[in-house]
Amino acid sequence: MQVQNIEGTLTAQGIRFGLVVSRFNDFIGQKLVEGAIDCIVRHGGSADNITVIRCPGAFELPSVTRKAAMSGKFDAMITLGVIIRGSTPHFDVIAAEATKGIAQVGLETMIPITFGVLTTENLEQAIERAGTKAGNKGFDAALGAIEMVNLYKQLG
């Protein structure tokens, strides 16, 4: 008996991507978008198959992602944004609700949805994760989306 392994490949050719990005902390969010686009193109995807959708903030990411995912225009959704802790409990509420909501959209739509939303203690950590010391989490989220689309295809 031989164990069967099923894995997604890392080729983006022909995949239609929706990138949903929150505008709050946009100077960092834009770096995440650039990282995601770079990843898709490096893995054989076309800029013609990438749509960037901007929403006001992280709290709106789940509903906008759901609407876009249900449109039938996309094979994968990549959520991007930046939530930085402040001096009030607002961070905890927004981070938790955005995370839960985005996960729920993936389960409801059965379209691969990846989470590239930074949740950091401070601005420096966010900048580090948007293309400096800690890589680019937009790139990482796009890579996950590519793999998941191909995995879903194999699973039927």
From Swiss-Prot:
Entry annotated with the keyword Transcription: no
Instruction: Give the record's family classification.
Output: Belongs to the DMRL synthase family.
Protein name stated in the entry: 6,7-dimethyl-8-ribityllumazine synthase
Task: Provide GO CC annotations from the record.
Answer: cytosol; riboflavin synthase complex
**Protein residues bound to (2S)-2-hydroxy-3-oxobutyl phosphate:** S87, T88, R129
Q: In which pathway does it act?
A: Cofactor biosynthesis; riboflavin biosynthesis; riboflavin from 2-hydroxy-3-oxobutyl phosphate and 5-amino-6-(D-ribitylamino)uracil: step 1/2
Function, as annotated, reads: Catalyzes the formation of 6,7-dimethyl-8-ribityllumazine by condensation of 5-amino-6-(D-ribitylamino)uracil with 3,4-dihydroxy-2-butanone 4-phosphate. This is the penultimate step in the biosynthesis of riboflavin.
List the NCBIfam families.
lumazine-synth, PRK00061.1-4
Q: Which UniProt keywords apply?
A: Riboflavin biosynthesis, Transferase
Q: Enumerate the InterPro entries for this protein.
A: LS (IPR034964), LS/RS (IPR002180), LS/RS_sf (IPR036467)
Active-site residues from the entry: H90
The source organism is: Chlorobaculum parvum (strain DSM 263 / NCIMB 8327)
Record GO biological process:
riboflavin biosynthetic process
User: Which positions are annotated as binding 5-amino-6-(D-ribitylamino)uracil?
Assistant: F24, A58, F59, E60, V82, I83, I84, F115
As its record notes, the protein acts as a catalyst of:
(2S)-2-hydroxy-3-oxobutyl phosphate + 5-amino-6-(D-ribitylamino)uracil = 6,7-dimethyl-8-(1-D-ribityl)lumazine + phosphate + 2 H2O + H(+)
One GO term in the molecular function aspect is:
6,7-dimethyl-8-ribityllumazine synthase activity
User: Which EC numbers characterise this protein's activity in its record?
Assistant: 2.5.1.78
Which enzyme class, named as a word? transferase
